[in-house]
Amino acid sequence: MAKEILQNSAHASVRMQRISPRKARLVADLIRYKSATQAIVILKHTHKKASEIILKLLNSAIANATNNAGLDATKLYVTTILVNDGPTLKRFQPHSRGRAYAILKRTSHFFIELTEINNVEEINKKGDK
């Protein structure tokens, strides 16, 4: 959320999801700069835990765009999707000789921004960076 929210856009976020950010970013990279309808198809055919979380988040952002901002759902594109580190739960696994090995249960914060774009070449310029 480093940049300001645009006028013709809508966003949604979810926090404290029990998935490693590194694994979730693999799925997030698949839908960045894609249309919302194309992103839904990609997420439904991706067999990863993160795809379910991001699909719910994308549907929420589409609902925010249509109901709150009054945008056209067919012209929405994923302009920003972020997966950041959340708090880490630290657990210990007993090991030999009285030792304990640390297990880090990582969590993630997700943020998605959809922008209504009439000219498709605008999004292609952003995707070429």
UniProtKB/Swiss-Prot annotation:
InterPro entries: Ribosomal_uL22, Ribosomal_uL22_bac/chlpt-type, Ribosomal_uL22_bac/org-type, Ribosomal_uL22_sf. GO terms for biological process: translation. It holds the Pfam family Ribosomal_L22. This protein binds specifically to 23S rRNA; its binding is stimulated by other ribosomal proteins, e.g. L4, L17, and L20. It is important during the early stages of 50S assembly. It makes multiple contacts with different domains of the 23S rRNA in the assembled 50S subunit and ribosome. The globular domain of the protein is located near the polypeptide exit tunnel on the outside of the subunit, while an extended beta-hairpin is found that lines the wall of the exit tunnel in the center of the 70S ribosome. It comes from the Bacteria. GO terms for molecular function: rRNA binding; structural constituent of ribosome. The keyword Ribosomal protein applies. Part of the 50S ribosomal subunit. Keywords: Ribonucleoprotein, Ribosomal protein, RNA-binding, rRNA-binding. This is Large ribosomal subunit protein uL22. The keyword Cytoplasm does not apply. Belongs to the universal ribosomal protein uL22 family. Disulfide bonds: none annotated. PANTHER family: CHLOROPLAST 50S RIBOSOMAL PROTEIN L22-RELATED, LARGE RIBOSOMAL SUBUNIT PROTEIN UL22M. One of its GO terms (cellular component) is cytosolic large ribosomal subunit.
